[in-house]
């Protein structure tokens, strides 16, 4: 009996050690000026934001989270009140974040991967664009002028992001992140009705599908691209050939009207004669 007890204990210990030895990523760092506040680790899934873990910060502001290594690049965020820091995870890496309670979402420092450095750059670019758009909305410019300025700002932003982040490295997690940034709650890149934007989604979808063909994000992005391509495809113009005996040449538009006696007359019946047509509208 005692031997069986020892055996069971050993098996349980081995199982617990195996669980602790599973590949995992780590997120750690400090948040200054946030004593007694709750810091949340959240998963940015395809279905929405999912809470993973949380900690109440002490005076030191140190925190440590961990999670199972994803099978393909995935996205998480740290949330303090209504401020968030976005980051990606694609291995057993350790992401180190240093931030302050004020400016938590933009003035943070992140170490651990190129992807997260680039994601921060994109966050700052988007924040700058949002600030310019807010100022434009308060400028008092005529609606037409303000709209033209808005289009110029957004197009300049998109050109910069396309060139430096999406087409430059479509296989990177930050390229995927760039596709889904928002302005005033709306996606900056349009995956459904903009032919040029669909090309950006297609570039990233192709790379993801090659690297992670079974990942949910790969399939979701691929389906989005297919729908966008269908929506933006130029309609094909088909030539219609009519039989020669069905074609009649006419130098005038034929009009069929009734006279005062109710008799029908066709304009072509009066060919060669001088005809005055009077159109009168009655209200």
Where are these regions (language model features)?
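Bacterial Sec-dependent N-terminal signal peptides
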Residues: 1-30, 281
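Structural signature of alpha-solenoid helical repeat scaffolds
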Residues: 170, 193-196, 213
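Short coil/turn connectors between adjacent alpha-helices in alpha-solenoid helical repeat scaffolds
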Residues: 148-149, 187-197
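A non-transmembrane, solvent-exposed segment enriched in polar/low-complexity residues
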Residues: 19-169
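N-proximal helix/coil linker or "cap" segments that precede and/or mark the start of modular domains
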Residues: 198-254, 258, 268-270
């Amino acid at each position: 009996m005692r031997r069986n007890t020892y055996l069971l204990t050993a098996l349980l210990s081995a199982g617990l050690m195996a669980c602790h030895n599973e590949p995992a990523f780590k997120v750690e760092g400090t948040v200054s000026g946030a004593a007694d506040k709750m810091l949340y680790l959240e998963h940015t899934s395809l279905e929405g934001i999912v809470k993973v873990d949380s900690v109440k910060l002490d005076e030191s502001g140190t925190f440590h989270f961990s999670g199972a290594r994803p099978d393909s690049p995935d996205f998480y965020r740290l949330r303090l009140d209504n401020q968030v820091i976005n980051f990606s995870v694609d291995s057993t890496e350790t992401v180190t974040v240093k931030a302050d309670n004020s400016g938590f979402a933009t003035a943070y420092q992140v170490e651990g991967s190129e992807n997260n450095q680039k994601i921060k750059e994109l966050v700052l670019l988007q924040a700058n664009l949002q600030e310019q758009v807010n100022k434009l909305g308060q400028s008092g410019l005529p609606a037409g002028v303000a709209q033209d300025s808005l289009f110029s700002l957004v197009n300049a932003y998109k050109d910069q992001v396309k060139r430096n982040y999406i087409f430059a490295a479509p296989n990177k997690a930050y390229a995927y992140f760039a596709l889904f940034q928002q302005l005033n709650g709306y996606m900056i890149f349009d995956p459904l009705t903009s032919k040029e934007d669909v090309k950006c989604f297609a570039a990233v979808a192709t790379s993801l599908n090659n690297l992670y063909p079974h990942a949910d994000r790969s399939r979701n992005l691929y389906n989005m691209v297919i729908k966008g391509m269908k929506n933006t495809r130029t309609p094909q113009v088909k030539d219609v050939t009519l039989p020669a005996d069905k074609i009649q040449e006419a130098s005038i538009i034929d009009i069929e009207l009734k006279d005062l006696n109710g008799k029908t007359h066709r304009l072509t019946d009066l060919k060669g004669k001088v005809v005055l047509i009077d159109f009168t509208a009655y209200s």
